[in-house]
Amino acid sequence: MGKQLRQMKIKEILHNHDVGNQNDLIRLLDKAGIEVAQATLSRDCTELGIIRSRTHQGFRLVLPEDSPGQIIRGLVGMEVQSISSNETAIVIKTLPGRAHGVASFLDQLKDIAILGTIAGDDTVLVIPLSIKDIASIIHDIQSNLSQT
């Protein structure tokens, strides 16, 4: 099966099922007759902007169009514990295991002032294009993660 058809099926599954993680998604794809490797599914999820967010029912894989952007911002924002910086970079502390989702969300914003992000388990390192823009980038990050 081609990439486009596989990604369409992924979207369909996420719209019709509460999927908690990529392993659950692999099982549902397998039931639909689609075999996919974990690495391929991970790339598909990144390309589709899928994030794993906490809901009242536990964790769930969420497509960006599943909810208005403000809800996704709020979900990702709830995972951020602090934002700090020094003279060269920005560090975002998250709940354990949530840094990748926050970094993915920031990458999806395609902010030209952000050169890139690196995620660990509970820490995101944000590298600015210019150190002169650090205060502005922090403000933009806080605005984009706002729940209001």
Swiss-Prot record:
Q: Which SUPFAM superfamilies match?
A: C-terminal domain of arginine repressor, Winged helix' DNA-binding domain
Q: Any idea where this protein resides? A: Cytoplasm
Its keywords, alphabetically, are:
Amino-acid biosynthesis, Arginine biosynthesis, Cytoplasm, DNA-binding, Repressor, Transcription, Transcription regulation
Q: Which domain of life is it from?
A: Bacteria
Is Cell membrane one of the keywords UniProt gives this record?
Answer: no
- Any one GO cellular component localisation term in the record: cytoplasm
InterPro entries, alphabetized: Arg_repress (IPR001669), Arg_repress_C (IPR020899), Arg_repress_C_sf (IPR036251), Arg_repress_DNA-bd (IPR020900), WH-like_DNA-bd_sf (IPR036388), WH_DNA-bd_sf (IPR036390)
Q: Cross-referenced Pfam families, in alphabetical order?
A: Arg_repressor, Arg_repressor_C
The family note in this entry says: Belongs to the ArgR family.
Summary of the function given for this chain in its UniProt record? Regulates arginine biosynthesis genes.
Q: What is this protein called?
A: Arginine repressor
Q: Which organism is it from?
A: Prosthecochloris aestuarii (strain DSM 271 / SK 413)
Q: What is the lineage of its organism?
A: Bacteria, Pseudomonadati, Chlorobiota, Chlorobiia, Chlorobiales
